[in-house]
């Protein structure tokens, strides 16, 4: 279970993802309780437990190869992207720039964990900067477009690190991290900051920090988890946790960024992909994972994307069945009112006839 990259930190009451310098893998969920009691707080480094599961063919790690050239092994970049010895800059702090970097190799892992070391910084004051970074696991790569420098109506997974509130009516606090799964039928609405297609999100103060900022994305057996380390405390903080997510294998990892009238430097320092050693049922093993359509078993109604100041959504979202039942009850109510009204009207007419 060490390779799963999780630990139950004794006394914390929550699980944390591991990365170098952070608490790493410990006893997994299947570990007997008496062993947990005997072992107590087991803490290790992910580089010890997971180094052999780092997938270098899908990872971007310093020292970079190809500095000063227009290409590098295993990765392609386009647009305004520049490669330096310290970082990959997707966009400079200039207006109307787009850039991206994409892995050469399609990923055929069913269970994985991506750690991203990034930095968003610039000279713009509050709400005078933009637009943010997008992290991708998608069917198509190197296709520029309006969604943080990449294409709209994509197939796959996107994690948006949005720094500018386009919707002036929103109460959410920016910067904001959100998740979207798409089968090509959905369009990202910048004017609403993607609220209509967002699965979940959280406020995350990652811009212009004086220390390193990290994000971790974990996908395993239909569960998608996003965590952040933004406070220089070597601790992961929960951001997003969704179940029922279906993603195919054979898609590509990438990162992109875009600026408009407002701008920022958008830098990627590293992207490290770890393979998670997870047991699957025989039925799951027999599935052709390359043919799976990106989907989520549970999608929120857009009306449920009503923010509170903390960036959380109200509970009790309206599913399709709930909307149907609500409309059915409303229709029945109208029919009952109409019938009662007709009966009352008829009785009044009969009463009036008797008087004449």
Curated annotation (Swiss-Prot):
GO molecular function, one term: metal ion binding
Organism: Canis lupus familiaris (Dog)
PROSITE patterns registered for this protein in UniProt: L_LECTIN_LIKE
SUPFAM superfamilies listed in its UniProt record: Concanavalin A-like lectins/glucanases
Residues that hold a carbohydrate according to the record: 96, 131, 164-166, 190, 260-262
UniProt protein name: Vesicular integral-membrane protein VIP36
Keywords, in A-Z order: Calcium, Disulfide bond, Glycoprotein, Golgi apparatus, Lectin, Membrane, Metal-binding, Protein transport, Signal, Transmembrane, Transmembrane helix, Transport
Gene for this chain: LMAN2
All ranges on the Lumenal side of the membrane: 45-322
InterPro entries on file: ConA-like_dom_sf, Intracellular_Lectin-GPT, Lectin_leg, VIP36_lectin
CDD domains: lectin_VIP36_VIPL
């Amino acid at each position: 279970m060490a390779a799963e990259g999780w630990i139950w930190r004794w006394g914390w009451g929550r699980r944390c993802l591991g990365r170098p310098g952070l608490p790493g893998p410990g006893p997994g969920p299947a570990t007997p309780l008496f062993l947990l009691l005997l072992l107590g707080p087991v803490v290790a480094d992910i580089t010890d437990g997971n180094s052999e599961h780092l997938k270098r063919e899908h990872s971007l790690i310093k020292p970079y190869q190809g500095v000063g050239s227009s290409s590098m092994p295993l990765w392609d970049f386009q647009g305004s992207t520049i490669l330096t010895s310290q970082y990959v800059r997707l966009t400079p702090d200039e207006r109307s720039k787009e850039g991206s970097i994409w892995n050469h190799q399609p990923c055929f892992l069913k269970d994985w964990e991506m750690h991203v070391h990034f930095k968003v910084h610039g000279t713009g004051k509050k709400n005078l900067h933009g637009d943010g970074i997008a992290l991708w696991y998608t069917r198509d790569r190197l296709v520029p477009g309006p969604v943080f420098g990449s294409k709209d109506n994509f197939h796959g997974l996107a994690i948006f690190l949005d720094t500018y509130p386009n919707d002036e009516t929103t109460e959410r606090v920016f910067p904001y991290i959100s998740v979207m799964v798409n089968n090509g039928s959905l369009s990202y609405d910048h004017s609403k900051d993607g609220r209509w297609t967002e699965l979940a999100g959280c406020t995350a103060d990652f811009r212009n920090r004086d220390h390193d900022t990290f994000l971790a994305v974990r996908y395993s057996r239909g569960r998608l988890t996003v965590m952040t380390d933004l406070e220089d405390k070597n601790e992961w903080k929960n951001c997003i946790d969704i179940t029922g997510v279906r993603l195919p294998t054979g898609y590509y990892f990438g990162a992109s960024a875009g600026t408009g009238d407002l701008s920022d430097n958008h830098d990627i320092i590293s992207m490290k992909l770890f393979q998670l050693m997870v047991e699957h049922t025989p039925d799951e093993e027999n599935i052709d994972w390359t043919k799976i359509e990106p989907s989520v078993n549970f999608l929120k109604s857009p009306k449920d994307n009503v923010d509170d100041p903390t960036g959380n959504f109200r509970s009790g979202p309206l599913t399709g069945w709930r909307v149907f039942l609500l409309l059915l009850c409303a229709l029945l109510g109208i029919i009952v009112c109409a019938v009662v009204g007709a009966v009352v009207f008829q009785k009044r007419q009969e009463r009036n006839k008797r008087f004449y």
